Amino acid sequence: MSRCDKISRRAMLCSAGAASFVAPAVARERTTDGRWTRLRRVVTSEDSNGRPVVIADGEPGNVVELNGTRISRLWESSGLPARLPLVTDAGVSAGNAYRPGFAGTSFYVAEIPGGKRAPAIPMHRNTTLDYMAILAGKIAFVLPDREIVLQAGDTLVQGGNHHTWVNRWSETCLLLFVVVTADDQKSSA
């Protein structure tokens, strides 16, 4: 059984047996229209003298709505390994992580509304390795032959299979994604 203690306004320490992790304590502050969670994005790196610098600190400037889902694109890197130091704000120009020809990583937050506001997200498959954490709410991760209910604190590693998302609950589900383009051996065989 896991146990979580609030250690600050922005984080919680959760432990399950021997494993511990820090999960965000989502404040759930809403945007001015009341629909979405207000997010803060901080980006740091080093200057040419090796001193820490803040490249960005504020709300994400790259937000889109797709099928009723709000996607806040926080960062992307082209190619692997990523290049350091960071010199420009790659979050402002981050595109769709699933676009043809993109190779690299993408970091974003998706908000999927629940209840009657929940749109149908079609079954789809991406050629990516996706790491996800559910920050708030509940969501059904639907595979062609089964459904897995995920809730705040759950994580998922999704490896290029057919899936969709369904939010049957009243609360908006807040998901954090790190997407890595993958070499799909099945497609190239």
Regions from the language model: what does each represent?
Residues 2-19:
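N-terminal secretory signal peptides and thylakoid transit peptides that target proteins
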Residues 9, 25-113:
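A short, N-terminal "cap"/entry segment at the start of jelly-roll beta-barrel domains
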Residues 32-45, 52-55, 166-189:
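Double-stranded beta-helix
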Residues 104-105, 115, 140, 147-149, ...:
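Ligand-binding loop in jelly-roll beta-barrel domains
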Residues 108-126, 160-161:
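Conserved short histidine dyad/triad with adjacent acidic residue
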Residues 126-140:
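Short, conserved beta-strand element in jelly-roll/cupin
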